[in-house]
Amino acid sequence: FNNFAVFGVLASGIMIVMLAGGFDLSIGSISGLVGIVSAVLMMDKIGVPTPLIFVIAITIGCTVGLINGLIITKIGINPIITTLGTLAIIRGTCYFWANQNPRIYNMFIQGFGRKFIADIVPYTTVYIIVFFIILALILKFTRFGRNLYTIGGNETLARLAGIPVDRIKIITYVISGFFCAIAGLLLISQLGSGRPEYGTGAELEVLTIVVLGGVAVGGGKGNFLGVFIALLIIGSISNGMVMLDVPVFLRQVVKGALLVMVISIDALRNRRNLQLY
């Protein structure tokens, strides 16, 4: 589960986006950018202090999320097209930093994604559980959480009800950017270096987890318990394929087929609900 923690953190953010009817394909690239920039800033010749590394990482993630949100809400571009574009831009920016080839020697960052409690429970598991509990409480007991479900269920009615739809959608992308930043720091902690390809393909894994966990692709439905269970299921399947030495290409086929299957089930469920009404 420790190796799958990055996807759990990313799922925390994209679920919030999807509940409000949004979509974010740039999560892997944002985490990769945060990771490689943070790793470069920790190099001996630069030596940025650890607390400032966290501030810079979170600022990068939230800023990119803010840009995504503003483009989607203020310009009106489809979220898939918007985040696909930012995915390419950010991934190219990652390769700009590639010639630095930074290694991670910062002891705190090394332990951030590797340490265990009593040599049994990974810190990363605790992070995910804490994130999920906090977000679940926000969704259940705050006006912001209720507004997310309302916007995802029917954006037009939400606007008529006076809910600040655009502002809330922008906030969801900023939240997603925050979790991308945490995921990027976990990546370089676990892998020991900063590489431009880190985070590539994370979108496939995370979307599969979130949709399998019961989050509707169109928004307005989902909870963190379902996503947590889906994370355990997908993590077990992935680790099982690694232990069985399943070829890499076949693992990708299985993951892609699983994503198509869960989205198809979601679409059929929505169609059936429409027929009932």
Model regions: which residues?
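Membrane-interface helix caps of multi-pass small-molecule transporters
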Residues: I16, V40, K45, L66-I75, ...
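Transmembrane helix-bundle core of multi-pass membrane transporters
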Residues: I75, P79-F144, I168-I171, Q190-G199, ...
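Transmembrane alpha-helical segments in multi-pass inner-membrane proteins
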Residues: C180, Q190-G256
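Hydrophobic alpha-helical transmembrane segments
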Residues: F7-G8, S29-L33, P51-T59, I81, ...
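Hydrophobic core segments of alpha-helical transmembrane domains in multi-pass membrane transport
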Residues: G13-M15, I58-G61, L87-G92, Y127-I138, ...
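Cytosolic-side transmembrane-helix boundaries in multi-pass membrane proteins
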Residues: R159-R167, M241-Y277
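Helix-loop-helix "hairpin" substructures at the membrane interface of multi-pass membrane proteins
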Residues: P49-A57, T63-N68, A118-G194
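Single transmembrane alpha-helix segments in multi-pass membrane proteins
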Residues: F1-I46, L70-I77, V210-F224, A257
